[in-house]
Amino acid sequence: RYTYETNVMGTVNLLECIRLYPSASSVLNVTTDKVYENKEWEWGYREIEALNGFDPYSNSKSCSDIATQSYIKSFFSRETSPAISIARAGNVIGGGDFSKDRIIPDSVEACSKNEVIHVRNPYSIRPYQHVLEPLSAYLWIIFRQDSDHSLADCYNVGPNEDDCVTTGKLVSLFCDCLLYTS
């Protein structure tokens, strides 16, 4: 329940503030690539694909995305409205990521304790990207749409398909960098 309250109602509350106190000129809702209905495709999803995240986290992000689109169509379609976009990013890794079940922090911890690194889905291909890459895209979207509202849209933010690796490969590369064997 808390996940929905945070991701859906948090988005609605923010959009309501923007609607009632129109001082923002450029807004970006950052969701996740997990908003898409998972069809087990081998290729990445496009911005036009159906939204329907399966698990509660992914589904709450789908709902946040849909709520944003609803507000855009209902309240922010005038020329004087703020430009509002949605960015959907894949797996972001980098500094400050100490949440539970995170591949890099978990690998660092296992290495520091000389333990085996446990990889839940070693063959899962994910669009891993360093936190500065999507951040750069977010800032670019906000900056550009502020002066050209026609750029307000939904954007997938991630690496090229050729740069996506399996989780197992990511851990292997990490271990190679540390000269660690799990």
Question: What are the language-model segments listed below?
Answer:
Residues C63, A67-Y71, S107, L170, ...:
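Hydrophobic alpha-helix immediately C-terminal to the catalytic Tyr-X-X-X-Lys motif of short-chain
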Residues Y180-T181:
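Conserved small/polar residues in nucleotide/adenosyl-binding loops
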Residues Y2-E16, L20, S25-S26, V35-V92, ...:
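Catalytic helix-loop patch of NAD(P)-dependent Rossmann-fold dehydrogenases
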Residues T11, L15, T68, L135-Y138, ...:
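Short-chain dehydrogenase/reductase
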Residues P105-I117, Y128-Y155:
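Alpha-helical substrate-binding/gating segment
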Residues I86, K100-P105, P127-L135, C164-G168:
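Conserved loop-to-helix N-cap of the C-terminal "lid" that shapes the substrate pocket in Rossmann-like
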Residues A89-G96, H118-Q129, S150-V165:
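Glycine-rich Rossmann NAD(P)(H)-binding loop
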Residues T32:
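Residue(s) in the substrate-gating loop at a strand-loop-helix junction
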